[in-house]
């Protein structure tokens, strides 16, 4: 939400020209991944270093160990909400490109340890994709009904809509996905 506000502010003062993007959640069963995507302001390599690495790795491991059996206790802790992803994912990737004209796209990869990689990549559009590679013992989070339930529980009051799944409608006497 704060990143959306920043994008709105940048647009209002003429520093950003473009459309505000969609927030989507996509499950890919064959790869056991959940991808959360937006067309927001994105991140630079420096911002990933500052906001993802420095904040999260300063105490995140101890915090996650303390609350590993109570995911609800993590919600709202600055810098640690993102790292709760490692409670269900064996690896997380962030593929992102900042709104800045001179920005290079980057991919950050981490397995939950303090070790990570960051590399420049090609990405046409601004925004971010966060890809969770779901642990074998957490496959329930790949089920459409479970993801839907969690999105409704934790995201229904967000000021931006989240697209997930396919819409079902009746056509020619049967239900189809669109």
Which residue ranges define each predicted feature?
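GHKL/Histidine-kinase-like ATPase module
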Residues: 116, 145, 160, 173-178
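GHKL (Bergerat-fold) ATPase N-terminal catalytic module, capturing the glycine-rich phosphate-binding loop
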Residues: 2-136, 140-141, 149, 156, ...
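A short amphipathic beta-strand at an alpha->beta junction
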Residues: 159-170
């Amino acid at each position: 939400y704060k990143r959306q506000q920043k994008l709105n502010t940048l647009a209002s003062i003429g520093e950003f020209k473009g459309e505000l993007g969609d927030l989507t959640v996509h499950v890919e069963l064959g790869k056991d991944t959940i991808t959360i995507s937006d067309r927001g302001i994105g991140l630079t390599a420096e911002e990933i270093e500052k906001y993802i690495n420095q904040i999260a790795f300063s105490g995140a491991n101890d915090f996650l160990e303390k609350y590993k059996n109570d995911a609800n206790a993590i919600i709202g802790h600055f810098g640690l909400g993102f790292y709760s992803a490692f409670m269900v994912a064996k690896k997380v990737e962030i593929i992102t490109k900042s709104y800045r004209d001179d920005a290079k796209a980057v991919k950050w990869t981490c397995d939950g340890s303090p070790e990570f990689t960051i590399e420049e990549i090609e990405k046409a559009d601004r925004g971010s994709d966060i890809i969770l590679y779901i642990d074998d013992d957490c496959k329930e989070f790949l089920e459409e009904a479970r993801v839907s339930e969690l999105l409704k529980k934790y995201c229904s009051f967000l000021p931006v809509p989240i697209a997930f799944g396919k819409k079902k409608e009746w056509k020619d006497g049967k239900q189809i996905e669109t």
